C-alpha cells in the first residue's frame, strides 16, 4: 500500500490508542526503547488535526516515534514512514499485505505472548522483556526461595505448602532470602569454612607471629572481613525461624528489629577491619610507640565472639540432616556421629585456644623471668616449637594429668593453670555424659531387657525360688526375647494401617510360607489373621492346652514339635506349619485333647473373639477349619455332631463350588501329610534347616498335589522346574461306570474291596456320614517316602467331580474301622486300570491293627 491508498484503519491516529489486534510475531532484536504511556501525546512535528474514523488519512499510516521498526523500515519515508513509500507497520500487528518481511510494531500494541510468558516487567531503563538480564534475575530469585526437595517437603508437609511458602517470599519484598533456600545453604556452608579458618588461624597469628604486614596475612584478613561484612548485610534480609512455633518471619521490619536485639552487636564488632586501622596508624607514629600496639592485638579476639554463632551452627546441623536423608543414612547413626564429632571438635578447639593463651599472656608481659618460656630458654625458638610446648602444657592441665614440664611458679601461670583445669574438667564431664547417652541410645532395647531381667532376678531371690525354676525362667526369657525387649504392641499401634499390615506380613513370612492354609488362602484373609496374632514361646514339657478345659485360643506353630494327647492314649504329632486348638473355638465347647510341647516351640496364638470375627467375613475358610477338625477328631477316634451337621448342611446346600471344595480337600490332605511326617520320626527342631527348593513354594505344592490327585498317569511327584506347569495336567473324569479293581498285591498292603456303585453327576465332595471311603491308588510303602517327596506327594487323593456311592447300612460298616467318617468318594480314572491298583479300604477293620499301624497302612494303601 502507498500513501494514496486508504490502507490505514479508522481511528489509527498518533494521538489515539487503537484496540489491540492479534498478537504479532516477535520482532528482530532492536535497540531498547522506553515503554510509552498508554495514551501518548500527539507528535509535535505533525499537525494535530483530528481525523474522522470513517476517513483515514495518511498520518494513520505513519509509524509512531515510539514504535520499533526493522532496519528495512528505516530505509525511506518521512516522519516515521516505512521505506519504499509503503507503511509496513501497524499499531495492531504486522501488515496484512504481501510485503510482510519489513514490519514495525507500534508502541500502542501490547507485548506478544512469548514475551509475556518468558519475561518479567521491563526495568526503569526500558529494558525489553525476555532479555538475558531478566533471565538471570529470575534464576537468582529462585535461589532465594525454598526448593521442592525432601527436606522442604518434610518441613512444610506437601509440595503445595512449599509453593505457598515460595509465594510468601515473593510477596515479602525484593531480595528477601528464605532460611531454607539453596542460596542460604551454600552461603552458610561458605561461612562455616571461614569460621573454622578464623578460629584456628587468628589465635596463632596473634600469638606467635610479630609481622602482620605480609601478603598472605593481609589477603586472609581482607577476604575474611569482606565476607563477614557481607554476612552482616545479608542477615538483615534473611528470614528468621522461630523454633517455638516453627514460624518463619519474612517481614523486613520484623527481621531488622529481631536481628538488632540479638546478634547484631557481636557481628558488627567482629566485622571491624582492625588490621587495616593498625596499618594506617602505623604510618603516622614512630616505631617506639608502635611497639605498644602489639598489646592491642588482643582486640583480634573479638572476631572469635562473632564466630561462635550457635544459631548458624544449629542451622548447619539441620542441613546435615537433609544430607543424611538424601544418602539414606539412619537417623540414629547420623545423630550419634554428629554429636561425637561436634564434641571432639569443640574439645580440640578449646585445647588450641588454651595453648595459644599459655604463650600469649607471657608474651604480653615481655616474658618475665619466672614464666615457663624464660625458664626453658625458649624465647627465641621457632613458632612451631613454642606452639607444641604450649599445647602440651594446656592439654596436661585440661586432662588433669600434670603440669607439663614443670609446675607453675608465677602467679600468672598459677591462674592460667586453674583456668585450664576448670575448662578441662567441664569438657571431660560433657564428653562422659554424651558418650553415655550415645551408648544407651544405640542399644536401648538391650538395656531395657537387662533392666527387666534384673527385676526378674530380684523377684526370684525375694521368693526364694529353687534353682530349677530359676533356670527355666532364664531359658524362657532367652528364647522369648533373645536379649532385646520392646513394646511391640505400642510400636505397631502408632503406625497407620497399611504400614502395620506390611510389617506384620514381613514378620510372619516364615509362618505363612510353611502353612498351606495361609499360602493358598485369600491374601485379605491372611492379613486379617496375621494382624490379630500374638507371639508366644513354650518350653519342652509345657502343656499348651489341657483336655476338658474351656478353649479361648488356637495356636499356629512357627517352629517346634507338639504332641496331641487324649485319654485313650492316642497320640498325634504336629510340627512347623500346623495349627491346633481350633475345634473348641468352632463349637464353643471344651478341649477335646491335650497338647504338650516336645521341643522349644515358637507359636502364634489367636483368641476366640478374633477367630470368629475373621471367619465371619470368610465362610470358605471356616469350612476349611471345620473339615480339618472333623478329620482330626476321626483320627483320634472322636466325633462332634455340631461340626458334622454344619458340614452336611453346606454339602447339601451347595454353598461352595468345585474349586473351593478342591482347595479345602488339599488343605485337609496336607494336614494329614504333616501328621504322618511327625509320626514317622521326622521331627523339626526349633530352627530347622531350610527346605529344598521344590518345597519352598506352597503354590507349587498345591498345583502338584492337585495334578497327581486327578492324573493317574503321573507315577511320581512333580519335582523341578516343570512343577509350576502341572495345573495343565488336571483333568476331570467323565461320568461312567467305575472300572474294576486291579489284581491284588501283597496281602499286607491289600485292603478288602469296597462295594462299587454306578456313578452319577456329583453334588458334593463328601460322602454321607457312615459310608465307607473307597480309594484307588498305587501301593507305596511308607518307608519309601523321602523327605523331599512327602510334602509334594498326593497321600490323600482329591475328590473327583462325581457323586459318591450310596452309603450302605450302618451295620455293614466295620466297627473297628479307622477310616475317616467323612472321606472322599470313589475316584474315577480315565486311563486303563494298572495291575498294581487295588481298593484302599482301611485294613484295620479286618486285621484288628493298632490305630497307629492302621493309619500307616491306610497311608500306604492310599498312595
Curated annotation (Swiss-Prot):
Consequence of changing residue 321 to E: Shifts voltage dependence of activation to more positive values and abolishes pH-sensitivity
Regulation: Activated by cAMP, and at 10-100 times higher concentrations, also by cGMP. cAMP binding causes a conformation change that leads to the assembly of an active tetramer and channel opening. In the absence of cAMP, the C-terminal region is thought to exert a tonic inhibition on the pore when HCN2 is in a non-tetrameric form. Channel activity is modulated by intracellular chloride ions and pH; acidic pH shifts the activation to more negative voltages.
Impact when changing residue 321 to R: Abolishes pH-sensitivity
Positions bound to 3',5'-cyclic AMP: 581-582, 584, 591-592, 632
Example of a GO cellular component annotation carried by this entry: neuronal cell body
Residues recorded as bearing Omega-N-methylarginine in the entry: 728
Gene3D superfamilies: 1.10.287.70, Helix hairpin bin (1.10.287.630), Jelly Rolls (2.60.120.10)
GO-annotated molecular function: cAMP binding; identical protein binding; intracellularly cAMP-activated cation channel activity; molecular adaptor activity; PDZ domain binding; protein-containing complex binding; voltage-gated potassium channel activity; voltage-gated sodium channel activity
Region described as Disordered: spans on this chain: 1-131, 730-863
Consequence when changing residue 312 to Q: Reduces surface expression and decreases current amplitude
Assembly: Homotetramer. The channel is composed of a homo- or heterotetrameric complex of pore-forming subunits. Heterotetramer with HCN1. Forms an obligate 4:4 complex with accessory subunit PEX5L; regulates HCN2 cell-surface expression and cyclic nucleotide dependence. Interacts with KCNE2.
Purpose: Hyperpolarization-activated ion channel exhibiting weak selectivity for potassium over sodium ions. Contributes to the native pacemaker currents in heart (If) and in neurons (Ih). Can also transport ammonium in the distal nephron. Involved in the initiation of neuropathic pain in sensory neurons.
Protein known as: Potassium/sodium hyperpolarization-activated cyclic nucleotide-gated channel 2
Amino acid at each position: 500500500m502507498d500513501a494514496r491508498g486508504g490502507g490505514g484503519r479508522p481511528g489509527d491516529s498518533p494521538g489515539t490508542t487503537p484496540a489491540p489486534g492479534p498478537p504479532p510475531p516477535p520482532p528482530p532484536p532492536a535497540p531498547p526503547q522506553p515503554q510509552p504511556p498508554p495514551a501518548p501525546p500527539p507528535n509535535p512535528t505533525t499537525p494535530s488535526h483530528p481525523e474522522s474514523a470513517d476517513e483515514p488519512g495518511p498520518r494513520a499510516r505513519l509509524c509512531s516515534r515510539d514504535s520499533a521498526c526493522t532496519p528495512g523500515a528505516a530505509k525511506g519515508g518521512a516522519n516515521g514512514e516505512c521505506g519504499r513509500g509503503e507503511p509496513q507497520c501497524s499499531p495492531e500487528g504486522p501488515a496484512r499485505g504481501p510485503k510482510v518481511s519489513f514490519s514495525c510494531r507500534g508502541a500502542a500494541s501490547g507485548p506478544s505472548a512469548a514475551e509475556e510468558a518468558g519475561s518479567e516487567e521491563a526495568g526503569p531503563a526500558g529494558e525489553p522483556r525476555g532479555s538475558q538480564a531478566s533471565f538471570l534475575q529470575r534464576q537468582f530469585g529462585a535461589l532465594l526461595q525454598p526448593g521442592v526437595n525432601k527436606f522442604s517437603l518434610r518441613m512444610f508437609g506437601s509440595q503445595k505448602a512449599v509453593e505457598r511458602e515460595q509465594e510468601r517470599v515473593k510477596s515479602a519484598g525484593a531480595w528477601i532470602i528464605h532460611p531454607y533456600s539453596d542460596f542460604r545453604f551454600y552461603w552458610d556452608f561458605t561461612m562455616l569454612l571461614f569460621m573454622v579458618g578464623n578460629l584456628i588461624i587468628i589465635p596463632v597469628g596473634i600469638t606467635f607471629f610479630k609481622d602482620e604486614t605480609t601478603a598472605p596475612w593481609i589477603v586472609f584478613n581482607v577476604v575474611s572481613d569482606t565476607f563477614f561484612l557481607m554476612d552482616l548485610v545479608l542477615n538483615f534480609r534473611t528470614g528468621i525461624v522461630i523454633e517455638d512455633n516453627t514460624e518463619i518471619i519474612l517481614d523486613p521490619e520484623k527481621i531488622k528489629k529481631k536481628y538488632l536485639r540479638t546478634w547484631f552487636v557481636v557481628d558488627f564488632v567482629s566485622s571491624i577491619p582492625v588490621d587495616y586501622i593498625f596499618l594506617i596508624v602505623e604510618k603516622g607514629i614512630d616505631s617506639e610507640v608502635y611497639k605498644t600496639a602489639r598489646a592491642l592485638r588482643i582486640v583480634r579476639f573479638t572476631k572469635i565472639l562473632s564466630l561462635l554463632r550457635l544459631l548458624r551452627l544449629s542451622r548447619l546441623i539441620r542441613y546435615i540432616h537433609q544430607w543424611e536423608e538424601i544418602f539414606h543414612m539412619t537417623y540414629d547413626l547420623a545423630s550419634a556421629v554428629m554429636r561425637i564429632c561436634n564434641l571432639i571438635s569443640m574439645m580440640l578447639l578449646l585445647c588450641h585456644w588454651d595453648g595459644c593463651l599459655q604463650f600469649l599472656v607471657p608474651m604480653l608481659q615481655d616474658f618475665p623471668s619466672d614464666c615457663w618460656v624464660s625458664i626453658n630458654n625458649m624465647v627465641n625458638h621457632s613458632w612451631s616449637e613454642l606452639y607444641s610446648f604450649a599445647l602440651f602444657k594446656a592439654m596436661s592441665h585440661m586432662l588433669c594429668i600434670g603440669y607439663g614440664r614443670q609446675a607453675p611458679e608465677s602467679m600468672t601461670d598459677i591462674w592460667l593453670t586453674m583456668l585450664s583445669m576448670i575448662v578441662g574438667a567441664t569438657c571431660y564431664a560433657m564428653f562422659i555424659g554424651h558418650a553415655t547417652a550415645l551408648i544407651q541410645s544405640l542399644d536401648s532395647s538391650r538395656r531395657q531387657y537387662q533392666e527387666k531381667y534384673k527385676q526378674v532376678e530380684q523377684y526370684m531371690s525375694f521368693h526364694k525360688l529353687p534353682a530349677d525354676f530359676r533356670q527355666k525362667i532364664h531359658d524362657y526369657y532367652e528364647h522369648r526375647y533373645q536379649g532385646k525387649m520392646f513394646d511391640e504392641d505400642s510400636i505397631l499401634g502408632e503406625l497407620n494401617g497399611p504400614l502395620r499390615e506390611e510389617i506384620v506380613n514381613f514378620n510372619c513370612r516364615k509362618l505363612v510360607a510353611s502353612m498351606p492354609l495361609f499360602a493358598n488362602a485369600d491374601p485379605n484373609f491372611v492379613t486379617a489373621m496375621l494382624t490379630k496374632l500374638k507371639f508366644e514361646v513354650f518350653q519342652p514339657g509345657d502343656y499348651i492346652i489341657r483336655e476338658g478345659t474351656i478353649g479361648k485360643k488356637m495356636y499356629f506353630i512357627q517352629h517346634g514339635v507338639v504332641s496331641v494327647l487324649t485319654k485313650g492314649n492316642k497320640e498325634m504329632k504336629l510340627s512347623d506349619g500346623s495349627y491346633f486348638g481350633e475345634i473348641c473355638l468352632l463349637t464353643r465347647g471344651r478341649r477335646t485333647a491335650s497338647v504338650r510341647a516336645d521341643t522349644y516351640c515358637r507359636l502364634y496364638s489367636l483368641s476366640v473373639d478374633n477367630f470368629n470375627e475373621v471367619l465371619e467375613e470368610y465362610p470358605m475358610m471356616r469350612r476349611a477349619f471345620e473339615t480339618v477338625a472333623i478329620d482330626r477328631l476321626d483320627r483320634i477316634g472322636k466325633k462332634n455332631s455340631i461340626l458334622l451337621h454344619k458340614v452336611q448342611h453346606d454339602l447339601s446346600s451347595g454353598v461352595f463350588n468345585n474349586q473351593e471344595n478342591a482347595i479345602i480337600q488339599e488343605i485337609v490332605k496336607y494336614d494329614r501329610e504333616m501328621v504322618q511326617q511327625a509320626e514317622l520320626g521326622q521331627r523339626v527342631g526349633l530352627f530347622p534347616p531350610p527346605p529344598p527348593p521344590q518345597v519352598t513354594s506352597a503354590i507349587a505344592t498345591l498345583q502338584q498335589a492337585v495334578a497327581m490327585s486327578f492324573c493317574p498317569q503321573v507315577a511320581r511327584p512333580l519335582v523341578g522346574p516343570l512343577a509350576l506347569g502341572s495345573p495343565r495336567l488336571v483333568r476331570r473324569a467323565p461320568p461312567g461306570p467305575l472300572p474294576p479293581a486291579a489284581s491284588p498285591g501283597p496281602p499286607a498292603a491289600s485292603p478288602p474291596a469296597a462295594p462299587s456303585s454306578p456313578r452319577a453327576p456329583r453334588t458334593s465332595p463328601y460322602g454321607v456320614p457312615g459310608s465307607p471311603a473307597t480309594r484307588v491308588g498305587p501301593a507305596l510303602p511308607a518307608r519309601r517316602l523321602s523327605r523331599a517327596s512327602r510334602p509334594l506327594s498326593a497321600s490323600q487323593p482329591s475328590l473327583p467331580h462325581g457323586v459318591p456311592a450310596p452309603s450302605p447300612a450302618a451295620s455293614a460298616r466295620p466297627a473297628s474301622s479307622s477310616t475317616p467318617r467323612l472321606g472322599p468318594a470313589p475316584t474315577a480314572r480315565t486311563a486303563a486300570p494298572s495291575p498294581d491298583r487295588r481298593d484302599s479300604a482301611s485294613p484295620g477293620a479286618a486285621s484288628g491293627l493298632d490305630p497307629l499301624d492302621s493309619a500307616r497302612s491306610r497311608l500306604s494303601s492310599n498312595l
